[in-house]
């Protein structure tokens, strides 16, 4: 099997081929070589596949759209912008927060919601993703929300679906988790006392295997954050991560000193092929987000985590449940961001069809 991907070959490659690539390089191969058909010619969203390729104005437009789903008291509101449309949730990987918040977002927008039971689907019987996709298209859904263990699966589906269907990436392998990245940006936008351009952000944990880290770093850079710090054992850092324009720290205390935002990441045990840590207790000792380390950050700093958390390994319970934690706010903000992305994707599809494409 070839170790290279080019945009000409995408329609004939199964997404399972992408899992052959090492997480050290998967982001480069996907972002440099894959066709990214996520924008219409007018710049509106046709599919939402990743943060890369979107500019600052487009990210700010998503944040601004999400803000419209909060009332004056900060409570989420319903708005039937997708009434009469059908959204199909295709989660080929287990999920609690992402799947549930997408479903809540879809229902708040008035959409008809179809949840496909993947455990009973034909993909479990050996059917290819392409054949599964073509059969699901016959159900006349307007939007597919896709989570898959193969990096590039959402891109693959975007090249295969009919023009009247939008694909939203709910997380693909090691590659990207764009709605998580955007809900993190919305959270920072709502909680930080300073604009993005003046923030120092520390990202701590399993960066090598984290699709969240890739999306967050890309979004932070696009929104103008100049001081992005990462800290993890060398075994959990992608090779050459410095090329992303981040500062790499080996010492956790130095990394979080004077930071505005500390973002913890889960250790991706299900994606790690062999042991990369001495022990959980050693990890917590050197890299855990503790009250003592939070005290090194700025007085108004806050902590974030995409979940699920490993308490006592990645983060102390007193921090996760403390006054500086915005972790539960992230969940609520996730509903607003997913409402925004769903609404903008449907607007983009209507614009695409109106243009006669």
Swiss-Prot record:
Q: Tell me how this protein assembles.
A: Heterododecamer (2C3:3R2) of six catalytic PyrB chains organized as two trimers (C3), and six regulatory PyrI chains organized as three dimers (R2).
Signal peptide (UniProt feature, chain positions): none
**Gene3D superfamilies (UniProt xref):** Aspartate/ornithine carbamoyltransferase (3.40.50.1370)
- Annotated region (Disordered) at 1-21
The record's comment on protein family reads: Belongs to the aspartate/ornithine carbamoyltransferase superfamily. ATCase family.
User: What organism, scientifically named, is this protein from?
Assistant: Psychrobacter arcticus (strain DSM 17307 / VKM B-2377 / 273-4)
- Its protein name is Aspartate carbamoyltransferase catalytic subunit
One Pfam match, by short name? OTCace
Catalytic activity as recorded in UniProt = carbamoyl phosphate + L-aspartate = N-carbamoyl-L-aspartate + phosphate + H(+)
Under the heading NCBIfam families, the entry gives: asp_carb_tr, PRK00856.1
User: What does this chain do?
Assistant: Catalyzes the condensation of carbamoyl phosphate and aspartate to form carbamoyl aspartate and inorganic phosphate, the committed step in the de novo pyrimidine nucleotide biosynthesis pathway.
Report the SS bond pairs: none
Give start-end positions of Polar residues composition bias: 1-17
Encoding gene, per UniProt annotation: pyrB
GO cellular component terms, alphabetically, are: cytosol
